[in-house]
């Protein structure tokens, strides 16, 4: 009776059971296929977001003057990216007028470069960061978007300084075995190679040519054509810390007490800009800022590009002279803070960089 009742009550029971069994057979492949499709879409989107557009060979990431002074400030399209000394050197951004100050990273940065939609810099969290990732020290050459997102390590090695040149970052790579050598890595990390075994400072660059001084047999001015990575002699002088600006190479004259000179790439002439002994300098569009080395009257100085009208910016010893379109930033030697600034052109007015303290 129960069997007869069940068979008549549910005459399609065996059919339904068969359909259910069939569904069980295809539902797993459908789920697996859906998950695979989602993974493919995620990877495609991630690849698109991580894509680094090509740069023209003329693109450079920062000025030689800024990079020779630590690369603590870099500017592009009205935005300034800087290593905030008031917050352990962490990466910040702001407008050129020092408004809209924003923290971008949780680690100390230097040698800041900007090109296109990306930032390139040396990052080191040895001074302390936040979160589990900072339990172990990490350092290296990094790339991120302009807002600090999508952080990517291009080379987990120590870097002395670096310069963006077109689609490559040229950098002085250092370790205790090989010491300092010049490497380059493509901005999308697809290529990395040794450029030279010698110590080459890549900071001074124009239109794909890196200008650097010799460090082994002489202190001549050399050019490195990044299109072929070939080296040639530009000027047989005795110079240090070359900086390119408007067809001139500004440099410290080693043979004459480190006075500041400039060499014309147009007519191959040399001009003496000051007889002061110079510790460091930076060249802007209107003025040269330099630290005068003097036992009696050390001072941060500025003068016009041809060496005329020298004037004192601040008495004492200063370092880390970085220039933006609005201000010249610097700090006292041996002291990270306070950071001072003065308008990069116009009347001198030295005040603390208070916007960075907020």
Model-assigned labels for residue ranges:
Residues 19-37:
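N-terminal Sec-pathway targeting helices
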Residues 55-64, 99-105, 149-155, 190-196, ...:
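A short beta-strand motif characteristic of beta-propeller blades
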Residues 58-90, 106-111:
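Beta-strand-rich domains and repeat architectures in extracellular enzymes and scaffolds
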Residues 67-74, 107-116, 156-166, 197-207, ...:
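Repeated scaffold domains used in trafficking and secretory/extracellular systems
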Residues 81-83, 120-123, 170-172, 211-213, ...:
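Residue position within the beta-strands of beta-propeller blades
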Residues 84-88, 128-139, 174-180, 214-219, ...:
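Short, solvent-exposed loop/turn segments at conserved positions within beta-propeller repeat blades
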Residues 95-99, 145-149, 185-190, 224-229, ...:
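Short loop/turn segments that connect beta-strands within beta-propeller blades
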Residues 317-358:
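Blade-level signature of beta-propeller repeat domains, shared across WD40, Kelch, NHL, RCC1
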């Amino acid at each position: 009776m129960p069997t007869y009742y069940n068979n008549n009550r549910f005459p399609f029971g065996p059919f339904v059971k068969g359909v259910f069994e069939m569904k069980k057979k295809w539902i797993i492949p459908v789920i697996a296929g859906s998950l695979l499709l989602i993974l493919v879409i995620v990877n495609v989107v991630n690849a698109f977001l991580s894509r680094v557009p090509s740069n023209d060979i003329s693109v450079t990431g920062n000025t030689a003057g800024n990079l020779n002074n630590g690369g603590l400030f870099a500017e592009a399209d009205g935005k300034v990216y800087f290593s905030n000394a008031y917050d352990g050197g962490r990466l910040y951004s702001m407008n050129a007028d020092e408004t809209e100050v924003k923290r971008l990273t949780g680690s100390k940065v230097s040698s800041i470069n900007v090109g296109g939609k990306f930032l390139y810099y040396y990052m080191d969290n040895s001074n302390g960061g936040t979160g589990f990732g900072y339990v172990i020290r990490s350092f290296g050459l990094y790339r991120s978007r302009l807002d600090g997102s999508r952080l990517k390590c291009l080379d987990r090695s120590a870097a002395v300084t670096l310069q963006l040149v077109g689609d490559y970052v040229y950098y002085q790579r250092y370790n205790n075995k090989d010491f300092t050598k010049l490497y380059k890595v493509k901005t999308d990390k697809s290529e990395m190679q040794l450029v030279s075994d010698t110590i080459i400072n890549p900071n001074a660059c124009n239109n794909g040519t890196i200008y650097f001084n010799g460090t082994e047999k002489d202190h001549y001015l050399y050019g490195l054509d990044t299109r072929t990575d070939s080296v040639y002699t530009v000027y047989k002088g005795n110079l240090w810390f070359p900086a390119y600006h408007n067809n001139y190479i500004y440099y410290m004259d080693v043979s004459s007490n480190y006075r500041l000179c400039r060499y014309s790439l147009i007519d191959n002439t040399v001009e003496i800009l000051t007889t002061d002994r110079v510790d460091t300098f930076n060249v802007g569009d209107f003025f040269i800022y330099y630290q005068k080395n003097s036992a009696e009257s050390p001072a941060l100085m500025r003068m016009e590009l041809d060496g005329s009208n020298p004037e004192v910016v601040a008495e004492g010893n200063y370092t880390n002279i970085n220039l933006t379109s609005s201000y010249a930033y610097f700090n006292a030697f041996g002291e990270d803070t306070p950071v001072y600034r003065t308008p990069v052109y116009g009347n001198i007015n030295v005040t603390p960089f208070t916007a960075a303290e907020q």
